[in-house]
Curated annotation (Swiss-Prot):
It is an enzyme of class 4 (lyase). One of its GO terms (molecular function) is cyclic pyranopterin monophosphate synthase activity. This is Cyclic pyranopterin monophosphate synthase. Its EC number is 4.6.1.17. Substrate binds at L75, C76, H77, M113, E114. Gene3D superfamilies: Molybdopterin cofactor biosynthesis C (MoaC) domain. Catalyzes the conversion of (8S)-3',8-cyclo-7,8-dihydroguanosine 5'-triphosphate to cyclic pyranopterin monophosphate (cPMP). The gene is moaC.
Amino acid sequence: MSQLTHITERGEAHMVDASAKADTVREARASAYVTMARATLAMILDGQHHKGDVFATARIAGIQAAKRTWELIPLCHPLMLSKVEVQLTAETEQHWVRIDAVCRLTGKTGVEMEALTAASVAALTIYDMCKAVQKDMFIGPVRLLAKSGGKSGDFTGDEV
């Protein structure tokens, strides 16, 4: 079984020293869902929200969050991301919005936390923009779908 990399032998939290790692292309893909009432989703899709374009705002928030993950999550490295993509898809049958985030770089550490943060903050932004019309929206699941590159190898999770 793998060991926790952010904990020393004495049980102290520390930032991993990545200086000896090789630069490789690393990519991660994460998703999040926001389930809401059909009327709330229709309002978003019809462009009738008084705060403006919900999807555009959530996309920008997700991109910005990925770039600032190191400021939000202790022990994350600041990264020079080469790509952050946030896609929002309304699935009217399930009355949810699916958020897919992809982060990529060439570097020494992975971008899983950046992809997860992008998807999460995009979901939170949708909630924030729509809470005036519906407070019981549901966020989740939020999960890592895939990662590639790096010493630990590739990972692909099952689709929800």
